[in-house]
């Protein structure tokens, strides 16, 4: 969210992550950091809250708090001491993060103008956030189905939910607009993008990078990877998508041109010879876990 001021503007974002894992704060921190950085040079301040039902064990809450604080420090964030809140209204444990950037100056990359004909670039592999969160919550069950090596490969992608590097590259590479994929997955993000741009779009499903690990875990739980949480994936709108994707790949970030904005209202997904239209965003597939 952006607020105009006499000195520029203020960018403020909030994200919430639910779950039983002590890692849940990482996802909320990554989501807010990425969102702010797509509109500002840096995050100036972060606020972290751990909320839980009255009966939640104290040790678990302090573990969640400690992990969130450690993650924020690792990524160079300034934050107030995380707060723990127990409440009767809380249905489960969650971490809420607010992040703020003050006095943001307008530059070429944050004028946020989109038009038909521009390319859509997608960074990294879709659904990795959701894949990691399923692993966090269902590790024992997954261990009976998949090898330890397979699960370790998933773990190695834990830092991919943070997008500082590719956002920095895009700012120098002619990007017009950046939007995080996030909750609801790539289908929801594309729908929101087209509505915001007041254009249509056409994208190639086969061009969207997805890890085999995500596909197999989604098949096991009968989930759609294209509707799975994707914090860390950034949609980038620019005039020359191939040049931007090349610049990102040179910085060791997976990137692909997946489509373009069009001068109508159709939101089209091509899958070989098949064509379908993007529906209104559905609930994130994580809700089924």
Predicted regions and their residues:
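Helix-biased detector of long, well-ordered alpha-helical tracts
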Residues: 1-289
